[in-house]
Amino acid sequence: MDADLTELVRQSAIKLKNSCDNLIPTLIKEQDKLNVIYNPLYYAWNPHNAYITRFSGNGAKILMMGMNPGHGMGNTGVPFGCPEQVKEFLEIKNLLVEQPRMNHPKRTVIGLEQPKSEVSGRRIWGLLKEMFETPEKTSEYIYIVNHCPLWMFNEKGQNITPEKLTGKSASQLYELCDQHLKEVVEIMGINVVIGVGNYAASRAAIALNDMDLIITKIPHPSPANPLANRDKGEYWKN
C-alpha cells in the first residue's frame, strides 16, 4: 500500500467535502427543484475515510465513476455502497455514521446497519467480487468514486440528479467535482476511466479532455435502466 498516495486522495476528498458543503446554501437558494441536500462525505466520513485508507493506495489504474450518491452511499459513505456489500465484502463495519444537517422524513439515514439494499451497489460490488474474489485484489485493479458527493431531493423527497441542475450554481458544482476527479486521476496515475452511465462518462470526458487516457462507459446497473434488468441483470455486465 502506498501511504503517501492514500493521504493525497484523502486530502482531495476533504477538499471536495468542504467546497461542496459550502456551496449547499447557494444550491438551495438558486435551484427551485432542490429542497434538501445531504453530504455523505461529512456525516458518513468515518466509513468513507476507511474506504480511502484501505483501497485507494493498492495500485489500481482503472477508475470506475458513478454520478452521485444514492441510497447506498447516502447511508454508508462508500460509492455504490450497498450496506450488505460494504459490511460483508469490503468489511467496513462498526463505524459511526452521523446524521445529515438537514433531513427529509422520506430519506432517513441509518448508516451501515441500514437494512434496505441498493440494487446498483449490489450489482457493481457483486460483479467485482465475482471477478477478483477479495476487496484487496479488486483494489489492485479498480477503484470506485462518484463524480458528485451530494445526494439531493425535492420537497417530496424525490431524487434530483446533478444533470437536472441549471445556472451558475450548477456550473460551480460541476467545476468542483471535475477538479476532484482530475486530482484523483493524477494522484493515482489512472489510465482508464469507466463511467457508470452516460452522465458519468460525459463528465469524465469534459474533466479529463486534456489527459492521455481511455474513457469508456458501462450501462448504469440501476433497476430503473431497462438494460440493467435484461436477462435477470446479467446483460449489463457485458
Label each residue range with its predicted role.
Residues 2-192, 201-202, 216, 226:
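A polyanion-binding, active-site-adjacent surface
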Residues 211-238:
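Short, flexible loop segments at boundaries between secondary-structure elements
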Residues 68, 198, 221:
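Active-site metal-binding loops of divalent metal-dependent hydrolases
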Residues 204-210:
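Short, aromatic/basic amphipathic alpha-helical patches
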